[in-house]
Structures are given as structure tokens and as C-alpha cells.
Amino acid sequence: DLSMTGFDEKELTDLLGADADGEAKEDDFDLSAALEKAAFVQRGDVWTVGRHKLMCGDATSAEDVSALMGDTKANLILTDPPYGVSFKSASGLTIQNDSMKNEEFYTFLLSSFQRMAEHLEKGGSAYVFHADTEGLNFRKAFIDAGFHLAGCCIWVKDSLVLGRSDYQWQHEPVLYGFMQNGKHHWYSDRKQTTIWHFDKPKHNANHPTSKPLDLLGYPIGNSTQENGVVMDTFGGSGST
């Protein structure tokens, strides 16, 4: 009953327009362009956060990584790339480049490892968090980028991560190695083992697979000295 609106038929027609009963028409508004214009951070931006540097860039781009590192050589790589497992959190968070096909994913990893290796000191060590299901691609790319694979450490979590597998995952492997162009350095004792027990974060609304800080601090302490430079071109899963 139009009378209930307080307007007569002519007033409603003028208010709603002549096409009010027609189909909705697509306008020329470019949502992608508007979002890019509104974005606070742009590709190529390098932010100084205390003693740290954070870049919005491409881990496979020699130009981007060079812009970040300049003439500085990292003493250590501690990186947490996409695992290639199409991860999606319960809240809907996903990870970019986490759903590549086999050969494409290997090429992606190789290129990113090569970029990091170019800015690592001679004999510099590297730790790479990864998924067992993509272990072959990670190991092959790691070795092909010039690293010696010295071992694989295991992060044992305090609780399982519920997923689609028959056996629920309660660990993550971490490749450990170093560049073969020089002597690598070790700053801990000979009692450290390949099994790392650290509780996993309870929740992080900003990143679906963040690592606990004490977990990351452990290999950093073993493989660098105070004021060492640690590089992760994948943003440290929101941690480093």
C-alpha cells in the first residue's frame, strides 16, 4: 500500500526514478582501482620498524630484494614460505601463493631461495619452515639454490592442528643448512637436538599460521651473534 509511505505515486516515481522497476545496470565504477588508490602501503615501500626493515615486495624479484637489503649481507635466513597446501583458517584467512601446482611451486621456491642466497654472507646458515607433504619440492629447491642440506629439525607443538588428514598434524619440519661458499658458524653447544618443543600460538587474527617468538628466537640464538642480520623475504609469518 503506497499510501503508507506518505508519498503519492508521482512523488515516488520522481524519488525512485523512471527505471526503478527496470533491471539494475552496471556502472563504470572500478573497484580494484579504487582499492589500490585507497591502499596505505604500495609495492616497493620499505618501512623501518625500530631496528628492523619491512618491505612490501616480491620475494622472487631480484630488484625488490636488492632494494630491501642494499649492500647489507644477512648473517642468517630464517624463513617461513607458503607451504603449498591451500591453507584456509576457520575464519577464512588464506595465504597467497599457497595453491600452486607442483612444478610451478618448485620454481617459485627456487627463485625465492636464490634471491635470499644472493644477499647472505658466505657460509651463512638457513632455516626453512615447510610442510612434509611438500618436502620434496622444498628440499630440491633448497639444494638447487646452492645450500647444503645439513639436517631437518622438527617443531613439536603442544596440541594437534585439526585438519582433513587421517593422522592429525602436531609438528612442522624445518630444513637446516648453509651456503657451500664458506665456513658456517654455530654459536651454541653440542647438546642441541633436532626436536624442538614449543607451544603453538592460541590465535592470531592477522596471520593464520604465525610462529611463536620463542620458537624463532631459538635458531636465531644458535646461528647468529648479537646484532646479527636475519632475513625472511616472506615476512616471518607475521612473527619475525
Regions found by a protein language model. Name each.
Residues 1-240:
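Core catalytic lobe of class I
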